[in-house]
């Protein structure tokens, strides 16, 4: 009984630590891309092209499961906005929805026997679809003009380098840390 309680405490501690690390990475990594944008004169282009905040969400979800992924996805954009003003207030709720879905879906697929790239792709499709639905509801249902429905397709096109980065980097990272799975199960 005591071993079981000790093990459960270890799992909770590992998941809490992973959540904090995931949120930290999801807030810090985009700042590097913003600095690159400032130095190169491209502004926010590197951030919107490479989608750096998404990496931490996918990684923590695939490592520690759906609760960790969903919390990381919901909190990261909110904390980033509070600290840096990015993403913009208009995009914040939609990004929170999208990243929460990413974290939840990837976390639910964590132990499924399928390639990492398919787990990520499934989460990307569902996350973008739900984000698109939220944008359409805001625009047509609530008559909000803060975000136009044209952003749905334009963000996919501009974020293609980030999607490719996620498809290549995440399987490699998870392969490198596969021994850490013992801390979450």
Stretch-by-stretch model annotation:
Residues 6-11, 108-117:
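Membrane-interface helix-boundary motifs at transmembrane edges
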Residues 53-57, 95-102, 166:
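Hydrophobic core segments of transmembrane alpha-helices in multi-pass, intramembrane catalytic enzymes
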Residues 34-47, 51, 85-93, 112-185:
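Membrane-embedded alpha-helical hairpins and interfacial helices in multi-pass inner-membrane proteins
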Residues 23-27, 76-77, 99, 128:
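Residue-level recognition of pore/gate-forming positions within transmembrane alpha-helices
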Residues 71-108:
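Helix-adjacent hinge/juxtasegments
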Residues 2-62, 67-68:
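Hydrophobic transmembrane alpha-helices
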Residues 16-21, 55, 66, 70-74, ...:
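Hydrophobic alpha-helical transmembrane segments
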Residues 26, 30, 61, 80-84, ...:
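Structural signal for membrane-spanning alpha-helices in multi-pass inner-membrane proteins
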């Amino acid at each position: 009984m005591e071993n079981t309680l000790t093990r459960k405490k270890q799992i909770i501690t590992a998941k809490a630590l992973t959540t904090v690390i995931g949120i930290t990475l999801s807030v810090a990594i985009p700042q590097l891309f913003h600095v690159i944008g400032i130095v190169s004169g491209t502004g926010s282009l590197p951030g919107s092209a490479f989608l750096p905040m998404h990496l931490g969400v996918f990684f923590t979800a695939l490592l520690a499961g759906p609760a960790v992924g969903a919390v990381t996805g919901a909190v990261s954009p909110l904390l980033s906005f509070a600290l840096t003003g990015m993403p913009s207030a208009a995009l914040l709720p939609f990004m929170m929805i999208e990243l929460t879905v990413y974290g939840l879906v990837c976390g639910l697929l964590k132990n499924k026997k399928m390639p990492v790239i398919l787990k990520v792709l499934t989460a990307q499709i569902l996350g973008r679809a739900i984000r698109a639905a939220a944008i359409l509801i805001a625009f047509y249902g609530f008559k909000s003009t803060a975000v136009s429905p044209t952003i749905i397709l334009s963000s996919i096109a501009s974020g293609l380098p980030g999607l490719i980065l996620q498809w290549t980097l995440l399987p490699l990272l998870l392969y490198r840390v596969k021994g850490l799975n013992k801390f979450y199960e």
